[in-house]
Amino acid sequence: DLGEPDAYVRLRELVEPAAARMNAQVIWVMGNHDERSDYSRLLFDEESHAPQDRVYDINGLRIISVDTTVPGYHHGEVTDDQLDWLADVLSSPAPHGTLLAVHHPPIPTPLLEAMGMLELFDQHKLAAVLEGSDVRGILAGHLHYSTHSTFAGIPVSVASATCYTLDLSAEDRLLSGVDFGQSVNIVHVYDKQLVHSIVPIGATTEVSGFPAGAWAQIEAMTPEERIETFSKKSSSFNSAEVSSNG
């Protein structure tokens, strides 16, 4: 939470080898606990105090990271200069469209009114830039809980957190960070669709399931056989799953 220099060093040591094993591009996005000077120096080997806005191309899918942070504050803003830059980038569509990555999600927070004080300010200015563009989705964080909405007609997906999450049911607290429900979001990009999956992290207890080896059995079947085996409630395959789990 303090944007300490050593945290960026350790972050690269953890993330970059994992990304290399997956042949994945790492895209960093500034958050309200980051400090621009250390962020740019230790993650990008650059000396800068400017907003950390960047453009990436992943096989024709454009990903734009926009720095919504305000130095010294927790709420978010996008300056007029940043908006002009973003409008210029979006003036030319990408082959597979664009994903916009920001920290502060441009959506309401009805279950936590306090977070409204820390939201992205002047959202109408960003909406004016995005309307009619090729932006297919907006990816965000900041809230420490998962939620979804739309903004300027664009789907918005907010990832929770891998540290602490906010308890949306804590009526006797202004905000309550808890050690529970941590997760990551995985986004699958198709030609005409985005699929957002919330994947819990940490220990869980299985209450129902099939062994991994069952997939080989299903793969060998025809489409019709798969329906009769996996979809039919009374099939021996499903009966075995029910009996083996109680």
Per-segment meaning from a language model:
Residues 198-209:
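Short, solvent-exposed aromatic-acidic interface loops
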Residues 2-6, 10, 32-39, 71-74, ...:
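Active-site environment of divalent metal-dependent phosphoester hydrolases
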Residues 20, 75-157, 186, 194, ...:
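His/acidic metal-ligating clusters that form di-metal
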Residues 60-70, 99-102, 154-160, 197-199:
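Active-site-proximal beta-strand elements of phosphoester/diester hydrolases
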Residues 158, 165-177:
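Short, surface-exposed loop/helix-turn segments at secondary-structure junctions
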Residues 1-48, 132:
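Core catalytic region of metal-dependent phosphoesterases/phosphodiesterases
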Residues 68-69, 110-114, 168-171:
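Short acidic, glycine/proline-rich loop/turn micro-motifs
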Residues 40-54, 86-88, 143:
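Alpha-helical scaffolding within the catalytic cores
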